[in-house]
Structures are given as structure tokens and as C-alpha cells.
């Protein structure tokens, strides 16, 4: 089967979050199952800096963006059996970052138009065209409406994956003519219109042959007003083509037996290396080196979505316990300042690292006893799976992908891979936090059993890619 991905970012070339991880891992895994896979990405300046001497220049053409003709340079690099095609236009993509510009609408309108026209020029007409998030959500519409006259495109099936419904791509209706070069018929009849704006995500949901999200629970949640971001009505209407598939993680990278970023390796049968990593991490961040104290790790953006309003609200209560907390992340300045203040007030209990460091993140995943992730909503989440891979038990809000991947501890059966709370409140977060500390302190045997269960869970992309393969096959 020929499968083509189109996305705004993809590891190792460009990455700001989970979308980049998916594009870096899923195509590679699909190749192992015998599929022919291509990926189209923007050619950013950070891509040029890392891979500029490895990519191959193929050709260039021009694409109409409204009344203008814009340059499209095409580059290619084959990595892990996947053909990566890059769309090069320095005006749009050499900005020093991936998102956040005033003209993001124009940038990604250009990218989508160029990607659709590129398929024919590289002679890669896929059986399935898989697009991701709002940045590429207009592509199913373009294939079926603007470019329907291209005979080779008529049998292409399209899949849209929603990684985060909060970001929908809402723009003035004038964009249809001024950038996409199409008429207003589908806006006038309401197909593309939402809240008197052009809504790219709505277009993708309606025009794609299948819509997936990154966990089964999130697929159900976004059909409700609480999580639907005002598109729940549309998602209920299209629920027959909505599927949730949990993301995987790259188990070759996140492997406690071989991880090059760790000083001490370990496995589920011998966790002594994990304890050595704990001591090394405590020493590195300036906390007292103690084996007996529960070490709680946090690696996250510091935002309300990630639940840090609750964490800051309860942090004083947390620090009254015999516990150590290591935080790594940046985000809302108010949360950064709060953690910095508590770090100064409790230097023996809290290490607040307001930055991002890949090596330190890996050490926190591997050395902590508990990983705190109380997200308000979480489409999938990767950190909890990474933590479990290293025998670190997650404490999560029971929502989205966190619900699907973390089995809460059952005191009667001893089953469980972490701890969870259902009611999103400071009281229940603190209650669950204390329960986790109590189990760590008073029942080492149960704790070790949970660590083993967590490390045995299969979060590899092999499982997820088989589910996607079945989904693609069902469309043909």
C-alpha cells in the first residue's frame, strides 16, 4: 500500500511536540509492515542546519497562492526506508521557529497547495493520504474540490488525525479566494463555515474519509461540549468515521537497558541501576541524596492545560510530606515564578529547573519514583508512557490518553501501573498524591510489582501502526 503523510512538523527534522514524534515514528513503523511510505514536510531553517548537507535537491515549480505565483523548491531525503520530501520556501519557513507568526494562515495555505500539487510531480500518488491537525486539514477539501479534475487523484482516500482539537485554524472567509483560489460555494452553504469564519479543522472533519484521534477516550471526549471545542456537534454528526488509536513511543530510544543518556542501565529484573540513577540525579540538582524518600518527577510545559494551576494550588501541601520533587519545563510566567519561589523556600525538597534539557528530561523519566502529569485534558500524552518504560509510576488525571494508558492501582488485586484521580480538583490531586507516597513508603513489594507491570506494557509503534494499517485497509 502507498501511504503519504503531510504534516507541519516531523522528527528528527522539526519538532515542537507530540505531532513531531508521531511523524518521526509512525511512517518508519509502517515501512516495517511492508508499506511504501512518503512524508511531505516544510523545509525549515532548523532542518537546513541539521540536514542541509544530506538532502537532495530535486526540482522546483511554482504554485498559485491566490493571484500570486510562489516558488516551491523540492528536496528529498530517504531515512529508515521512508522518503521525506521537503517543500522549500525561505520566505515562509526560515523563521527560526515552526509556529506563531502573524501569517501562519498564509504559510500553511501555501504549504497545503504545494503538497497537493507535488504528489503528481514526484509520481507518488498514494492509496491513502494522511494529514495531521489543522495545518493540513484543508487538503481533503482541496483534493475533492479544487483538484478533482486530476484523474490520478480521484481514488485517493484521506485520513485526518486530530492531535489537539483546541487549534482549529479559523480565518476570514476571504482566504478561500485570496489564498486557496476557490469560490465561496462551500462557505455559503455552511460546509466550511463555523462561527462566521473559515474553519480548517471543520473542513477536514467533513471531507476526510476517516478521522482519527490519538486515543480512544479522546475520540469519545471530543464529541461532548466539555472537550469538543465548539466542534462537538460536527463530531457527533460524523462519529461513524471517528476512530481513536493510541500513539506509541520509540522503544529503541526509550530503553532503560541501552539509553545512552543514562549513566546506569537497568531492566525489570534488576532495578539497582534505577536507584543509582536516582542518587546521581539528586546530586546533580542539589537535593539531599536519600534512597528512602519518594522522588517525584515533572517534565512538562507549565500551562493550565497541563494542570499546573492545580499543582501550584496544592504545592504547599505536597511539600509538607517527606518527598522530593524535580521539575523541568517552561511555560506560563506565573507558574514559573511560583515554582522558583517554592524552590527557594524548600531547597531540600524542590528543584525547579525552568528550562528544557533533553538529557535532564531523560534522567527524570528514568530516576524518579513517581511521574506527575495531572493534565486538564490530554489527547494522548507520551510522557506517561516514557515514564512507565523506565519503571516510574505516573500519577495522572483520568482523562484522554492518560486513561487509556495508565491502569490505576487496585489495592485488592495489586494490579496497576500508576495512580489516577477522576475529579479535576486540588483535593483529589492531593489525596491521590498522598496515597502514592504512602504505598511507596509502606509497601515496597506492591511498588516493585507495579514497576514490573509498567515496564511490561507494550507502548511500541508496532502496535499502533498495525491499527493504522487495518484502518487504511478498510478504506480500500
Curated annotation (Swiss-Prot):
SUPFAM superfamilies tied to this protein: UDP-Glycosyltransferase/glycogen phosphorylase
Enzyme's top EC category: transferase
GO BP term, example: glycogen biosynthetic process
EC number(s) recorded for this UniProt protein: 2.4.1.21
Function noted in UniProt: Synthesizes alpha-1,4-glucan chains using ADP-glucose.
Pfam families attached to this UniProt entry: Glyco_transf_5, Glycos_transf_1
Molecular-function annotations in GO: alpha-1,4-glucan glucosyltransferase (ADP-glucose donor) activity; alpha-1,4-glucan glucosyltransferase (UDP-glucose donor) activity
Official protein name in the record: Glycogen synthase
PANTHER family noted in UniProt: ALPHA AMYLASE DOMAIN-CONTAINING PROTEIN, GRANULE-BOUND STARCH SYNTHASE 1, CHLOROPLASTIC/AMYLOPLASTIC
Annotated CDD domains: GT5_Glycogen_synthase_DULL1-like (cd03791)
Pathway this chain belongs to: Glycan biosynthesis; glycogen biosynthesis
Catalysed reactions, semicolon-separated: [(1->4)-alpha-D-glucosyl](n) + ADP-alpha-D-glucose = [(1->4)-alpha-D-glucosyl](n+1) + ADP + H(+)
Residues involved in ADP-alpha-D-glucose binding: 15
Keywords: Glycogen biosynthesis, Glycosyltransferase, Transferase
Family: Belongs to the glycosyltransferase 1 family. Bacterial/plant glycogen synthase subfamily.
Amino acid at each position: 500500500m502507498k501511504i503519504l503523510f503531510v504534516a507541519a512538523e516531523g522528527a528528527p527534522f522539526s519538532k515542537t511536540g507530540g505531532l513531531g514524534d508521531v511523524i518521526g515514528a509512525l511512517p518508519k513503523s509502517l515501512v516495517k509492515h511492508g508499506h511504501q511510505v512518503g512524508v511531505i514536510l516544510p523545509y525549515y531553517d532548523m532542518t537546513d542546519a541539521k540536514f542541509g548537507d544530506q538532502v537532495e535537491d530535486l526540482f522546483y515549480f511554482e504554485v498559485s497562492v491566490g493571484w500570486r505565483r510562489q516558488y516551491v523548491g523540492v528536496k528529498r531525503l530517504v531515512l529508515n526506508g521512508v522518503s521525506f520530501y521537503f517543500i522549500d520556501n525561505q520566505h515562509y519557513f526560515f523563521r527560526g521557529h515552526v509556529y506563531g507568526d502573524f501569517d501562519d494562515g498564509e504559510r500553511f495555505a501555501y504549504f497545503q497547495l504545494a503538497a497537493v500539487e507535488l504528489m503528481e510531480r514526484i509520481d507518488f500518488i498514494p492509496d491513502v493520504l494522511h494529514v495531521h491537525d489543522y495545518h493540513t486539514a484543508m487538503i481533503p477539501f482541496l483534493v475533492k474540490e479544487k483538484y478533482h479534475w486530476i484523474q490520478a487523484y480521484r481514488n485517493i482516500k484521506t485520513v485526518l488525525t486530530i492531535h489537539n482539537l483546541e487549534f482549529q485554524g479559523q480565518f476570514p472567509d476571504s482566504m478561500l479566494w485570496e489564498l486557496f483560489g476557490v469560490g465561496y460555494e462551500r462557505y455559503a452553504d455552511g460546509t466550511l463555515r463555523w462561527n462566521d469564519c473559515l474553519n480548517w479543522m471543520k473542513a477536514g472533519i467533513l471531507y476526510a474519509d476517516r478521522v482519527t484521534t490519538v486515543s480512544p477516550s479522546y475520540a469519545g471526549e471530543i464529541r461532548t461540549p466539555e472537550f469538543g471545542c465548539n466542534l462537538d456537534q460536527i463530531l457527533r454528526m460524523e462519529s461513524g468515521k471517528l476512530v481513536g488509536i493510541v500513539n506509541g513511543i520509540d522503544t529503541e530510544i526509550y530503553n532503560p537497558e541501552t539509553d545512552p543518556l543514562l549513566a546506569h542501565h537497568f531492566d525489570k529484573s534488576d532495578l539497582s541501576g534505577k536507584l543509582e540513577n536516582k542518587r546521581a540525579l539528586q546530586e546533580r540538582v542539589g537535593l539531599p541524596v536519600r534512597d528512602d524518600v519518594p522522588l517525584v518527577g515533572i517534565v512538562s510545559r507549565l500551562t493550565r492545560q497541563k494542570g499546573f494551576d492545580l499543582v501550584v494550588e496544592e504545592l504547599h501541601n505536597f511539600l509538607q510530606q517527606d518527598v522530593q520533587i524535580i521539575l523541568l519545563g517552561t511555560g506560563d510566567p506565573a507558574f514559573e515564578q511560583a515554582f522558583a519561589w517554592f524552590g527557594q523556600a524548600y531547597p531540600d525538597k524542590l528543584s525547579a529547573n525552568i528550562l528544557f534539557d533533553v538529557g535532564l528530561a531523560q534522567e527524570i523519566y528514568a530516576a524518579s519514583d513517581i511521574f506527575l502529569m495531572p493534565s486538564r485534558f490530554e489527547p494522548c500524552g507520551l510522557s506517561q508512557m516514557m515514564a512507565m518504560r523506565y519503571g516510574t509510576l505516573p500519577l495522572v488525571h483520568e482523562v484522554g490518553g492518560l486513561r487509556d494508558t495508565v491502569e490505576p492501582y487496585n489495592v485488592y488485586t495489586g494490579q496497576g501501573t500508576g495512580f489516577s484521580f477522576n475529579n479535576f480538583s486540588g483535593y483529589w490531586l492531593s489525596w491521590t498524591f498522598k496515597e502514592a507516597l504512602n504505598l511507596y513508603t509502606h509497601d515496597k513489594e506492591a511498588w516493585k510489582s507495579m514497576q514490573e507491570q509498567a515496564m511490561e506494557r507494550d507502548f511500541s509503534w508496532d502496535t499502533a501502526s498495525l491499527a493504522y494499517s487495518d484502518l487504511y485497509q478498510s478504506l480500500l
